[in-house]
From Swiss-Prot:
Entry keyword set: Disulfide bond, Protease inhibitor, Secreted, Serine protease inhibitor, Signal
Pfam family, one: Kunitz_BPTI
Location, primary (coarse class): secreted
Annotated GO CC locations: extracellular space
Function: Serine protease inhibitor.
Name of protein: Kunitz-type serine protease inhibitor nigrescinin-4
Signal peptide (UniProt feature, chain positions): 1-24
InterPro entries assigned: Kunitz_BPTI (IPR002223), Kunitz_BPTI_sf (IPR036880), Prtase_inh_Kunz-CS (IPR020901), TFPI/VKTCI-like (IPR050098)
Protein family according to the UniProt entry: Belongs to the venom Kunitz-type family.
Disulfide bonds: C31-C81, C40-C64, C56-C77
CDD domains in the cross-refs: Kunitz_textilinin-like (cd22594)
Amino acid sequence: MSSGGLLLLLGLLTLWEVLTPVSSTDRPEFCELPEDSGPCKGLFHVFYYNSDQNQCLEFIYGGCYGNANNFKTIEECKLTCAA
């Protein structure tokens, strides 16, 4: 196969990987963690992935600690965790 053909194949495989939705087996383990506001008293509107409902939901984050199932935007949550 020519180098141009290899580059085309690599490009197509990369595009396929980017566009393929996340499946539950590919989902990071932290997506299964519950929402966790943490002990601080801030009022940050963020999103977490609810594995029971299979969707990203908003919650209030206090600003410290918590866990990794915490996203600034719903888009970031969906790209990382939603199938």
